[in-house]
Amino acid sequence: MKNMNTKKITTLIVLAAALVALPACNDFLDEMPDNRTELDSSDKITSLLVSAYSEHTYPVTCEYASDNVDETALVSPDFEPEQEEYYRWQDVTAAVTNEAPQAVWSQYYMAIAAANQALDAIKELGGADTPQLKAAKGEALICRAYAHFVLVNVFCQHYDPAHPDDLGIPYMEKAETELDPKYERGTVAEVYAKIEKDIEEGLPLINDVIY
């Protein structure tokens, strides 16, 4: 009899502990697995758009490959091997600076990803139905257009109506939801058409309400 009472008490203690732990477990499961911010407000979306601007630049890379550089005899201590590769139009294998092609490519697509995340979040909130969300949508579209404009000019032939089928770049119009997705590059003409579409949609929405 004593053993039965002990088992009953033990069972009740275990059940009570489980009931106490359930809310804590639910709270844990409610957290994002990687601590990302849930974009559930206009202010959070506006803050995200800071990341829709690339931290890296491209003019230095293009300048070293241009006719404006004509002297390589004197090498500065700050000279990077990749800069000579730009000058000689060689494949860039010694990329270490923020202006390296690999850095420009990845950083501008990261900026595009931030813009697309903002656009998706605006849709999930019911659309751009407030002045702040309208302005945020406009900024995201313009940022996306500009980043693609930089990429298509740095990595592709410049737009020429006589050669509309020149190979372009992937135009990212939505946030990625799967690992290592495959994209079509399309043509330079198609990229410019999408840039124009984003600009025409985004520009009328921009105002100073979020600045």
What are these regions (language model features)?
Residues 29, 33, 152-159:
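Short amphipathic alpha-helical interaction/hinge segments
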Residues 70-72, 136, 142-143, 172:
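Acidic helix-start/capping segments at beta-turn-to-alpha-helix junctions
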Residues 154-197:
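Short coil/linker segments at helix-helix boundaries
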Residues 1-25:
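Sec-dependent bacterial lipoprotein signal peptides
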Residues 84-155, 186-189, 201-210:
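Conserved, well-structured interaction surfaces
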